[in-house]
Amino acid sequence: MERSVTAGKWLAYCRLMRIDKPIGSLLLLWPTLWALWLAGGGAPAPWTLFVFVAGVFLMRAAGCVINDYADRHFDGHVKRTASRPLPSGEVSEQSAKVLFVVLVLLAFGLVLTLNTMTIWLSVAGLGLAWVYPFMKRVSHLPQFVLGAAFGWSIPMAYAAVSESLPATCWMMFLAYICWTVAYDTQYAMVDRDDDLKIGVKSTAILFGRFDNLIIGLLQFSMLALLLILGTMTGLGMPYYISLLVAGGMFIYQQILTAGRERDACFKAFHNNKYAGMAIFIGVLFGL
């Protein structure tokens, strides 16, 4: 019995860190890889690659923990999140705080093996990750903060590889923010009715009936910025083909979300992991 209880507790911690749902890690991983390859004009050093890949999974897990801690009094009132470990009581608030600190320390320990610029940037990134979960209390624009928090791996990657933050770095960062706001608005559309009842704010609520139009504009802006980025860095035809592929996926997502049904919006959100992968393949073969 004791062994089964222990196993159940570990499973609850895994669910709290979303180990069973890697979509968030993938949406963070792909642009990190774009930046690592573009910053150095090719494959980064193996250790640098390891630090960033491990850091993606550690910080995404930490972000999920602090997000659920911040939302612990709201999640129980939302159908999709009521069974999460904190609102269901499977994991205590104190345990969640300890887990968050452990994950952050592990990630920071890896960053300490990189250069000074990257270390300082990581401190700013932690601040963004901490602020994001609480933004939905005070603003309808938490998705923009999420984009900055998730996208902060881009300047960190440039700093780690080239010890510089050129214009191309910030162009990619801005493109990623546009993409994040687009896909996280799709995600927020799933919970929009529940969020309205409990007073949680989001871009899905702010955009209202113009949600799909604004998502489309954000997706177009992302592709336009990445197109300019490609010309600035001299990327080859495979990269531009990958942008067309991603654009096709965005059109598919628009078709999915046209009826604003929960399952369709969630499916559209998940489709973004393939768009990110397609662009990385384009970067890989376009260099």
UniProtKB/Swiss-Prot annotation:
Keywords, in A-Z order: Cell inner membrane, Cell membrane, Magnesium, Membrane, Transferase, Transmembrane, Transmembrane helix, Ubiquinone biosynthesis
Single Gene Ontology MF annotation: 4-hydroxybenzoate polyprenyltransferase activity
Short name of one Pfam family: UbiA
Membrane-crossing segments per the record: 23-40, 99-119, 141-161, 163-183, 213-233, 235-255, 266-286
An example Gene Ontology CC term for this record: plasma membrane
HAMAP family assigned: UbiA (MF_01635)
UniProt record similarity statement: Belongs to the UbiA prenyltransferase family.
Function description: Catalyzes the prenylation of para-hydroxybenzoate (PHB) with an all-trans polyprenyl group. Mediates the second step in the final reaction sequence of ubiquinone-8 (UQ-8) biosynthesis, which is the condensation of the polyisoprenoid side chain with PHB, generating the first membrane-bound Q intermediate 3-octaprenyl-4-hydroxybenzoate.
Protein name from the UniProt record: 4-hydroxybenzoate octaprenyltransferase
Organism from which the protein derives: Pectobacterium carotovorum subsp. carotovorum (strain PC1)
